[in-house]
């Protein structure tokens, strides 16, 4: 006879946000919208990721990445921000750490900027409005 023990529970599944050693992947969220930063944070923490910090513009993001490196596994980077845009911040992070994993966050209609970011070295992109499944899939694919 089949019992409950024959079916793994959702609690037995290893969250996507955990490294093989059980530690969480650490993410720096760079976005000038507090709403978007909070939304990304909620999506990521629900899967076991740790939001290591947030930054409100490219300047802040680059400074925090440098200060926390190598303790950041991935950066989510908005393209359009004050002080320093996401493309420039991406370039500065990659100058500092050529192996940095940066995922660009973009509004619809910014395809040319997304292409530019990918050519410069961004590992993937996510389009706003955020879709939980796509956010998790794209981030997980970069961290594999």
Swiss-Prot record:
Alphabetized SUPFAM superfamilies for the sequence: CheY-like (SSF52172)
Function: Involved in the transmission of sensory signals from the chemoreceptors to the flagellar motors. CheY seems to regulate the clockwise (CW) rotation.
Organism field: Treponema pallidum (strain Nichols)
Keyword tags: Chemotaxis, Cytoplasm, Flagellar rotation, Magnesium, Metal-binding, Phosphoprotein, Two-component regulatory system
Gene: cheY
Gene3D superfamilies associated with the record: 3.40.50.2300
Binding site for Mg(2+): 31-32, 78, 80
Swiss-Prot/TrEMBL GO biological process terms: archaeal or bacterial-type flagellum-dependent cell motility; chemotaxis; phosphorelay signal transduction system
GO molecular function, one term: metal ion binding
Entry superkingdom: Bacteria
Family matches, as Pfam families: Response_reg (PF00072)
GO cellular component, one term: cytoplasm
Cofactor(s) needed: Mg(2+)
Principal subcellular localisation of the protein: cytoplasm
Statement: the UniProt record of this protein carries the keyword Transmembrane helix: no
Residues found modified as 4-aspartylphosphate: 78
Post-translational modification: Phosphorylated by CheA.
Localization, UniProt: Cytoplasm
SMART domains according to UniProt: REC (SM00448)
Residue span, Response regulatory domain: 26-143
Keyword Magnesium belongs to the record: yes
Co-factor note (free text): Binds 1 Mg(2+) ion per subunit.
The protein's name in its UniProt record: Chemotaxis protein CheY
